[in-house]
């Protein structure tokens, strides 16, 4: 990466991000603006992918809401996310868990590991 770009983005990187990987269940506290007020909306689900590096790193969280799969993609270093909590650590052997989109019920479960 260009040293100038790297020096500009260094100050914008967040340091309060917990370490999490695909397969982990996370609770994302996202700031949502409705009209003139702002509130925190909690989105809890399984991390199915993490891509990019540095300031442009993103992760995708998937949950089932009302029987329908919902996915949201967040930048890791955005100020729109208040905090990220890791609820469970999952044991998977893939970096991208897109195959979970085709599974439902017990087949979509991920084995938990203790840390």
Swiss-Prot record:
The keyword Ribonucleoprotein applies. The lineage of its organism: Bacteria, Bacillati, Bacillota, Bacilli, Lactobacillales. InterPro entries: Ribosomal_bL19, Ribosomal_bL19_CS, Ribosomal_bL19_sf, Translation_prot_SH3-like_sf. Belongs to the bacterial ribosomal protein bL19 family. This is Large ribosomal subunit protein bL19. GO terms for cellular component: cytosolic large ribosomal subunit. Pfam families: Ribosomal_L19. SUPFAM superfamilies: Translation proteins SH3-like domain (SSF50104). It comes from Streptococcus suis (strain 05ZYH33). Keywords: Ribonucleoprotein, Ribosomal protein. This protein is located at the 30S-50S ribosomal subunit interface and may play a role in the structure and function of the aminoacyl-tRNA binding site. Gene3D superfamilies: 2.30.30.790. GO terms for biological process: translation. GO terms for molecular function: structural constituent of ribosome.
